[in-house]
Amino acid sequence: MSETPRLLFVHAHPDDESLSNGATIAHYTSRGAQVQVVTCTLGEEGEVIGDRWAELTVDHADQLGGYRIFELTEALRALGVSAPIYLGGAGRWRDSGMRGTAPRRRQRFIDADENEAVGALVAIIRELRPHVVVTYDPHGGYGHPDHVHTHFITAAAVASSGVAAGLEVGADEYPGKPWKVPKFYWSVFALSAFEAGMNALQGKDLRPEWTIPPREEFYFGYSDKDIDAVVEATSDVWAAKTAALTAHATQVVVGPTGRACALSNNMVMPIFAQEHYVLAAGSAGNRDERGWETDLLAGLCLDGFDAR
């Protein structure tokens, strides 16, 4: 009898899950895996696209976070996930804002009590018992403070969730039955995929107000030799990812052909058909000629489950 695979994605704000891992999430839910997404803040400090949402922002009604709960719920539904999970509960920690911005509100995620935040995620891991956990790399992708802190909290929680209670140094201080996560991945962007995606775009894929970003904007990309795994989107999975991005209407605009999108800065991003990963902990399974796994579950004993 096969065991249902369980995957857990941990992100900082609503929309991060769709931008970084939308294809991967839809890939596994469409094959019967149990996938959950933990979001650490409501993205209250985010910029919005267009005048329609302007009154929601922090300088006006400060209701953007509440609205983004709706957006995230719709995006996850498009990806096949039943409902969002919020670290500590919805609104427990607030979006910290971009690096260099003045702290305007208390309870910023980057100021969260470490023991409380790690403990909240340990409790989720021990309850869900995921075979795979995914979050950002140590730089938080492009470096948003909440992304960096999400990496730190997730790495600590993955390490702590498998520690049994006892008197020894490092013994368990969190409730729940220990669960050692078999595989822990960082979600990363491949330079080769960015370049291929940008080169494939045509005028019909773009909106008039969009601009082409210089390559230096993608300074956080990874070379192929540093990547361990890839998940490739089928047409159905691609459609699910595009629908999820469209659901985040305050943050993302999808282009006319569904091949590209842009955030509030109007810089074009390809909607990637491949999503790439670095294996941070655990044992790799079979690799292809590039040296990449093509299944995040590779090497795990889940008899009878087909993730292809």
Curated annotation (Swiss-Prot):
Identify the enzyme class: hydrolase
Can you tell me which residues bind Zn(2+)? H13, D16, H147
- InterPro entries, per the entry: GlcNAc_PI_deacetylase-related, LmbE-like_dom_sf, Mycothiol_biosynthesis_MshB
Gene3D superfamilies with a match to the protein in the record: LmbE-like
**Disulfide bonds listed in the record:** none
Biological process (GO) annotations held by this record are: mycothiol biosynthetic process
The record's section on Pfam families has:
PIG-L (PF02585)
Q: Its Gene Ontology molecular function terms? A: N-acetylglucosaminylinositol deacetylase activity; zinc ion binding
Q: Does the keyword tRNA processing apply?
A: no
Q: Does the keyword Metal-binding apply?
A: yes
The annotation note on the cofactor reads: Binds 1 zinc ion per subunit.
Top-rank taxon, per record: Bacteria
EC numbers for this chain: 3.5.1.103
Q: Which UniProt keywords apply?
A: Hydrolase, Metal-binding, Zinc
Q: Cofactors per UniProt?
A: Zn(2+)
Q: Which reaction does it catalyse?
A: 1D-myo-inositol 2-acetamido-2-deoxy-alpha-D-glucopyranoside + H2O = 1D-myo-inositol 2-amino-2-deoxy-alpha-D-glucopyranoside + acetate
Give the family this protein belongs to, as stated in its UniProt record.
Answer: Belongs to the MshB deacetylase family.
Q: What is this protein's function per UniProt? A: Catalyzes the deacetylation of 1D-myo-inositol 2-acetamido-2-deoxy-alpha-D-glucopyranoside (GlcNAc-Ins) in the mycothiol biosynthesis pathway.
Q: Entry's PANTHER family?
A: 1D-MYO-INOSITOL 2-ACETAMIDO-2-DEOXY-ALPHA-D-GLUCOPYRANOSIDE DEACETYLASE (PTHR12993:SF26), N-ACETYLGLUCOSAMINYL-PHOSPHATIDYLINOSITOL DE-N-ACETYLASE-RELATED (PTHR12993)
Name the UniProt record assigns to this protein: 1D-myo-inositol 2-acetamido-2-deoxy-alpha-D-glucopyranoside deacetylase
Name the species this protein comes from: Mycobacterium leprae (strain TN)
